[in-house]
Amino acid sequence: MMIEYKNHKIFAFSDTHGLNYRLKIPKDADILICAGDCADEIDRFNCVDTILSRFFDWFSRQSAKVKIFVPGNHDVLFDLNPKLAIKLVPSSIVLLEDSGFEFDGISFFGAVCRPWMFTNAENKVPKGVDFLITHGPAPGHLDNNKGCKRLGEIIEESKPKFHLSGHIHELGGQSEATETTT
């Protein structure tokens, strides 16, 4: 999905599951956001460090000025061995896990929101952040009735301009609610 915002072209994607090389990234995108699940279902417990390394190598070679990554539920190394997972992320990629980042007047916040865990990000999400990025969706927005209720409350409280998520493959797309796009 391409978003034009504050004179930047932002391309967001998720759930490539090892098939990132098939993704057609627009050449004019200057900010890339991956909302998780770059690892493949079959290999998620076996060679996940190799899969993550391949993804990060591919992601870092993209021509965008900024590349942001928020892990998903298949990127299990971030849960099982976070120190190793963090070492795999090149310095050219911004890893957001319950943390924020700003670029050229655009604020981003990545919250850990995977199906089995939602951390204490609610204490950290800044009000009015431009982009809230989670892997899991909020309820009522492309979620197949599986959205995280607490995430929905956090979105109501923090009022991000955009909420980017993935996880529910069959409902990929874009929806709008009031002033927030999810």
Stretches found by the model and what they are:
Residues 1-4, 97-105, 174-179:
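Short acidic-hydrophobic surface loop/beta-edge motif
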Residues 39, 44-49, 127-161:
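Active-site-proximal segments of metal-dependent phosphoesterases and phosphodiesterases across multiple
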Residues 13, 18-103:
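Core catalytic region of metal-dependent phosphoesterases/phosphodiesterases
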Residues 11, 33, 68, 96, ...:
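Hydrophobic/aromatic beta-strand patches that form the interior of the parallel beta-sheet core
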Residues 65-68, 140-182:
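Conserved beta-sheet core of the metallophosphoesterase superfamily
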Residues 17, 38-39, 73-76, 112-114, ...:
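Catalytic metal-binding/acid-base residues of hydrolase active sites
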Residues 18-24, 51-54, 115-125, 141-150:
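Pre-active-site segment of Zn-dependent metallo-hydrolases
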